[in-house]
A protein has these predicted regions:
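Conserved beta-propeller blade repeats
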Residues: 1, 35-53, 74, 81-99, ...
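Short, solvent-exposed loop/turn segments at conserved positions within beta-propeller repeat blades
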Residues: 10-16, 57-62, 139-145, 190-197, ...
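Predominantly five- to eight-bladed beta-propeller fold
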Residues: 14-16, 101-149, 194-198
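Short loop/turn segments that connect beta-strands within beta-propeller blades
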Residues: 22-26, 68-72, 152-156, 203-207, ...
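Polyanionic (Asp/Glu-rich) segments that form extended negatively charged tracts
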Residues: 245-254, 258, 292-295
Length: 324
């Protein structure tokens, strides 16, 4: 499965669609007949379904779709108020997790006067108490936070899991498919101490919130081992420097027995994945502008697997690419 992005000269924009092919490159075809923008395809654990995100008819949002491999039929399973991201199947295939921005009420100092009919007024003033309220490439940021949700893979009403007024990112389903492991910065001064995120676990009814890590520095990118006993994650001890190397760590599912996997690799790593037998971890790293794929044992024995990983777009002079 992969996403193909094309430029539409008639609409002066981009369009994206999901394509599928066999491992040997044969039987290459578009997955659906839809003309909407599609993204984020994910195989179900049993390989019988594919979840993906597709834009709505009016292009004002997105919905979660399911494609049934045997029948080649597909359908929306959600009716969301926003656009979902980072969809992930639970291990038992019953649910789909996702993150979504939830807007907050905009700060208003006084009640504005009533606008006369047919009046042409300037836009309302923007009032914010946020330290970070603008971003390069997107301009002013909306008031609100990213939260975690789940929905039945058969469709239905989504359930919001997190509610604290912080951003919740980089999540993973737990072994019993009844909750998430996620990264967030719950510090009171999180806007100023923005690097200091921790890992947490939470049940899918929003209760039983537990903090798993506690140090000065970011912890994120958690992936659960196949047997459900170990969590691998990324992070570093923040020494308040411009650049700091991201390292690989392990801990027990309850947050105990934390240790760094000493790889002797003086490079930041990303994109963790467990091997099926749980004995190795796959990851990516950049070496002198060359993106590589490697694996390591739980004791730090590294094997380089792929060199010269590249992407299909060039936006900035950096390395890149993706691996499945």
């Amino acid at each position: 499965l992969y996403v193909r992005t094309e430029m539409d000269i008639m609409k002066d924009g981009r369009s994206s669609s999901i394509w599928i092919l066999n491992a040997d490159g044969s039987n290459h075809q578009k997955l659906t007949s839809s003309t909407r923008n599609e993204s984020s395809p994910r195989w179900s654990p049993d390989g019988k379904r594919i979840s993906f995100i597709s834009s709505s008819d009016d292009n004002n949002g997105s919905e979660i779709f399911i494609y049934w491999v045997d029948s080649k039929q597909y359908s929306s399973i959600s009716q969301l108020s926003g656009s979902p991201r980072s969809i992930k199947w639970s291990r038992n295939g019953k649910y789909l997790g996702f993150s979504m921005f939830v807007p907050e009420k905009t700060l208003q100092l006084v009640s504005p006067p009533r606008k006369p009919k047919n009046a042409e007024w300037a836009e309302k003033p923007r009032i914010t108490e946020r330290l970070k309220h603008e971003a390069d490439g997107s301009g002013y940021m909306r008031e609100g936070f990213t939260h975690l949700f789940y929905i039945s893979s058969e469709g239905g009403k989504p359930t919001q899991v997190t509610s604290e007024k912080y951003n919740h990112t980089s999540y993973e389903w737990n072994d019993n498919s009844n909750g998430f492991i996620f990264s967030s910065n719950y510090n009171e001064d999180w806007e100023y101490d923005f690097r200091n995120s921790e890992l947490y676990s939470i049940s899918y009814d929003g209760t039983d919130l537990k903090q798993l890590t506690d140090r000065k520095g970011p912890d994120y990118g958690a992936v659960l081992s196949p047997d459900g006993n170990l969590i691998a994650y990324l992070g570093y001890d923040d020494k308040i420097q411009t650049y700091q190397t991201t390292n690989l760590y392990l801990m027990d599912i309850n947050g105990g027995n934390k240790r760094e996997i000493k790889t002797n690799l003086d490079r930041s790593i990303s994109s963790l994945e467990w091997s099926k037998d749980g004995k190795r971890l796959y990851f990516m790293y950049d070496d002198e502008g060359n993106t590589k794929v490697a694996s390591t044992s739980l004791y730090g024995n590294i094997k380089n697997l792929v060199d010269n990983v590249g992407g299909t777009t060039i936006g900035r002079p950096y390395g890149g690419g993706s691996v499945s």
